[in-house]
Regions:
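A short alpha/beta connector and helix-capping loop motif
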Residues: 15-35
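Nuclease catalytic cores that cleave nucleic-acid phosphodiester bonds
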Residues: 34-148
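Extreme N-terminal starter segment of soluble prokaryotic enzymes
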Residues: 1-3
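Intrinsically disordered low-complexity regions specifically enriched for long asparagine
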Residues: 9, 148-150
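Short acidic, Gly/Ser-rich segments with clustered Asp/Glu that frequently serve as metal-coordination loops
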Residues: 8-15
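Residues immediately flanking
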Residues: 8, 33-34, 158
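Generic enzyme active-site microenvironment
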Residues: 5-7, 95
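Conserved small/polar residues in nucleotide/adenosyl-binding loops
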Residues: 153-160
């Protein structure tokens, strides 16, 4: 079971490559706006053929990164709802926008694996090499954050000495 949140403004139809391979228990949430609200006939056909559930989220834009903020908020909502139900699916953000790396790092620190992928095909095959720089950066930030947290919790305060 997986959720795929699509930054359609960013990846367009190419981000949907592999949608026909998804399973019945997968869900694709397409975030789009007036800036990117059209698709090819080929993509339309694949969306009709996929077993996955497709949800469309039209985003009203007017401020910079409006779609990104709504996608990030919806991801948090999904994670909360699924955890409340005792379900722990995989989460993928389909984008080429490196701005989502901090979101991935945050959820990883919370024990929730969120991955960034460029299209659904790579999301379906998580061993595929996609963006090693973003993944390496995420690992460095996570390790740095964990080390700082340990220091905060293991260092005695002046009152304790």
């Amino acid at each position: 079971m997986a959720y795929y949140l699509i930054d359609f403004e960013n990846v367009k139809s190419r981000g949907m490559e592999g949608v026909e391979l998804l399973a019945e228990e997968d869900t694709v949430c397409i975030f789009y706006s007036d800036n990117a609200d059209s698709m090819t006939f080929d993509l339309h056909r694949k969306l009709n053929e996929t077993k996955a559930q497709i949800i469309y989220h039209k985003v009203a834009v007017g401020t910079k990164n409006a779609l990104d903020f709504q996608l990030a908020t919806y991801l948090g909502y999904l994670i909360c709802e699924q955890q409340r139900e005792g379900i722990h699916p995989d989460y993928f953000i389909v984008t080429k926008d490196n701005g989502f790396t901090s979101l991935m790092v945050y959820w990883k620190a919370q024990g929730v694996p969120v991955r960034i992928t460029r299209n659904l095909l790579w999301g379906k095959n998580p061993t595929a090499e996609q963006n090693p720089a973003a993944e390496e950066n995420a690992m460095e930030v996570t390790e740095s954050t964990e080390q700082e947290s340990c220091l905060l919790y293991t260092s005695p305060s002046p009152r304790d000495s």
